[in-house]
């Protein structure tokens, strides 16, 4: 299965964000949602949907998202993405390419990825920022169907995230898990946790002092959480990263949604 999702935004004469170009092939669908009380006023809320029960060997998901200048998009997904069992040497792939226009804002939080027994999955995400643009991007992955006794029973998981501005990298984050060759339950790895989440925030309009204050606020929020291991780090330039280890996907999802609202409220783009 080769599936494509292409989505772009435009700004109406009333200053509201709408879908512009929109193309999907099965099993993808996109549904726009009613406006709700949000710090990003006049933004577009949408849900990325899929009718697939999961990814199989040789499946390729190709996602392209482009935001026009001065537009704002909050994009969520409908359900977990499951990578099904496959023969040794096979794998499924997802490629995501995102481009943010000047003064645009994107909050993209897909549901968790679940790695079934004997599965292999490779994903790359490349995001190009523009002047004064703002990004909140999250990823959550589960090491298997833990309630079925699957812990690190998958074969391979590889994830590469690159965020750049004017062809200059702001952050590059790579995860490579090979359970048969790596001690992934050791100290400083996953230990006894079953879910990992990463949330990256980049706002090129913020200076280092402002970002440091936001890091302190999120560290205080993290200190209130239970049954999670949370770290908040300031990037070298214009942003921060939150990394979480937990025993359930939903608590990471809810935490990231809460952090997203905190970060949106501090946006300096109206």
UniProtKB/Swiss-Prot annotation:
It is found in: Cytoplasm. The keyword Transmembrane helix does not apply. Keywords: Chaperone, Cytoplasm, Nickel insertion. One of its GO terms (molecular function) is nickel cation binding. GO terms for cellular component: cytoplasm. Pfam families: UreD. Signal peptide: none annotated. It comes from the Bacteria. The keyword Cytoplasm applies. UreD, UreF and UreG form a complex that acts as a GTP-hydrolysis-dependent molecular chaperone, activating the urease apoprotein by helping to assemble the nickel containing metallocenter of UreC. The UreE protein probably delivers the nickel. Belongs to the UreD family. Required for maturation of urease via the functional incorporation of the urease nickel metallocenter. This is Urease accessory protein UreD.
